[in-house]
């Protein structure tokens, strides 16, 4: 759930000793299942409770730069992390902790008769993507651009797909939901978004070899973290013990 800025800002003077037993982690929506599964183990190990704010990495970065109190930022691409780093908001450097793959999806009934990623450009196909500023939306468009003129596709394949986009979503979970509900003919998500509830309602389509970039996920403690020690502890946990929870949900080791 993406928290409103007003709630995230909290009240002046709230930071301090009371924050030593808790942290707030701003994390890409695609990390929800893995991070929520890992949180109890982190709390058991450290005694620190975790509150998550999941959403599109671009929106989370903007909230951080607007002053929303957060201890850790976990992004689904390096672009949004760099934006926060360039503003001087990181406590040290970011580290890549996981990778992910793109996959095309269509509703199980396949009303658009989409048989391949190439069909995304066919006139009349209703494509649902994340917005271009959202990591998965950027990765998808980069993949389409790599497919221009390849394997019999037109030189303007990416532009043709863009013309078919009927909705630009705020995060990858929204894309998965719309396609699983049949509110679009085709979409692009991460392979890790194929949770049982989604996988039972969609069919998957593979990108051509070499077309789809691999998503890199960086994580970092934030300079203005209310609980600096807790932030460092969570980052260390994700880079080590937390890897088993990421792998169990389909993420690739960094």
Residue positions per predicted region:
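Exported/periplasmic ABC-transporter solute-binding proteins
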Residues: 15-58, 62-68, 75-78, 82-90, ...
């Amino acid at each position: 759930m993406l928290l409103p800025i007003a709630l995230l800002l909290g009240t002046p003077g709230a930071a301090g000793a009371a924050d030593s037993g808790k942290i707030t982690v701003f994390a890409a929506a695609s990390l929800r299942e893995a991070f929520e599964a890992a949180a109890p183990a982190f709390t058991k190990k450290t005694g620190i409770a975790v509150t998550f704010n999941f959403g599109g990495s671009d929106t989370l970065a903007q909230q951080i730069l607007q002053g929303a109190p957060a201890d850790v930022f976990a992004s689904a691409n390096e672009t949004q992390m760099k934006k926060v780093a360039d503003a001087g908001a990181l406590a040290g450097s970011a580290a890549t902790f996981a990778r992910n793959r793109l996959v095309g999806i269509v509703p199980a009934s396949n009303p658009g008769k989409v048989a391949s990623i190439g069909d995304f450009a066919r006139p009349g196909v209703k494509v649902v993507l994340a917005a271009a500023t959202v990591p998965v939306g950027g990765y998808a468009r980069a993949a389409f651009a790599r497919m221009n003129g390849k394997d019999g596709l037109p030189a303007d394949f990416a532009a043709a797909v863009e013309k078919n986009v009927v909705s630009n979503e705020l995060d990858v979970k929204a894309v998965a939901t719309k396609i699983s509900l049949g509110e679009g003919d085709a979409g692009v998500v991460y392979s890790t978004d194929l949770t049982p509830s989604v996988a039972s309602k969609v069919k998957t389509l593979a990108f051509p070899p070499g077309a789809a970039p691999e998503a890199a996920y960086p994580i970092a403690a934030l300079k203005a973290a209310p609980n600096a020690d807790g932030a460092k502890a969570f980052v260390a946990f994700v880079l080590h013990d937390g890897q088993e929870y990421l792998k169990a949900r389909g993420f690739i080791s960094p």
